[in-house]
Amino acid sequence: DETTGTMGFGIFYMMVNIGGFLGPAMSSYLRTEYGWRIIFIQAAVVIGINLLVVLLFYKEPKVEKGPKTPILTEFKNSIGNIIEALKDKRLTILLILMVGFWTMFNQLFYTLPNFIEDWINSNELSNWLNENIPFLGTLMTQDGQVKPEWFSNLDAFMIIILQVFVSYFVIKMRHLHAIIRGAIIATIGVGLTFYTHNPWFTIIGTMIFAVGEMMSSPTLSSFIAIITPKGKEALYQGTYFLPVAAGNFF
């Protein structure tokens, strides 16, 4: 409901980002020690483990099977259902807004690492880590610089430790206001990450972006759940991924 939905989706989002943090952390170590090829092997192994978990422990709910429909007809029906859902103006406006958000989000992984590699001098931070926290220095630095993926990974780390706290305050806002404010905060954060060559601007900007993400993304899922007509839950929740796809395109 409106009271618990935002918190529930926030907790779900936090759990997703545990994997989002551990994956790059493991890949960072492996690519430094063994080269880039091992990362693809790592990804295949993790996917294989997930598949085994699903096969062994997931039980498909029993549903009554209707008459079989040709694949082409199913495809046409799916497109028609999406168009029908997009006739809901509230949903369409939010999805358009989130296209911009996901376009910004992808810069953390597509553009920012290249910017850090070419323009950010994190030598002082690298030296401090190696002198004071050798374990983190070994894991996070290479050739006198902090590895780019660890700047991006700060986003997932912030979500893990602060999502429940942020969701608690977002509950007190109207859904649309929370989404818009989150998008504005995220925009400020992305702007700061690319503003100067100072690594602290990159760190602070990524942290600010994470706050905006924590406000916007789970709240959108919660809002979609609230406005969804009964019986169309899967259809409306599926439209959540339309701006994700558009953000990857842009």
Give the location of each predicted region.
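Structural signature of transmembrane alpha-helices in multi-pass secondary transporters
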Residues: F12-V16, G20, D155, L220, ...
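Short amphipathic helix-loop junctions that connect adjacent transmembrane helices
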Residues: Y110-K147
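Intracellular loop-helix junctions on the cytosolic face of multi-pass helical membrane proteins
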Residues: E2-T6, L22, S27-F109, P113-N123, ...
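C-terminal ends and interior cores of transmembrane alpha-helices
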Residues: I184-H197
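Helix-to-loop junctions at the C-terminal end of transmembrane segments
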Residues: I161-H175
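Intracellular juxtamembrane helix-capping segments at the cytosolic ends
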Residues: D1, M214-P229
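Loop-to-transmembrane helix entry/capping segments in MFS-fold secondary transporters
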Residues: E2-F12, Q145, T228-P243
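Hydrophobic core of transmembrane alpha-helices in multi-pass small-molecule transporters
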Residues: W200-S216
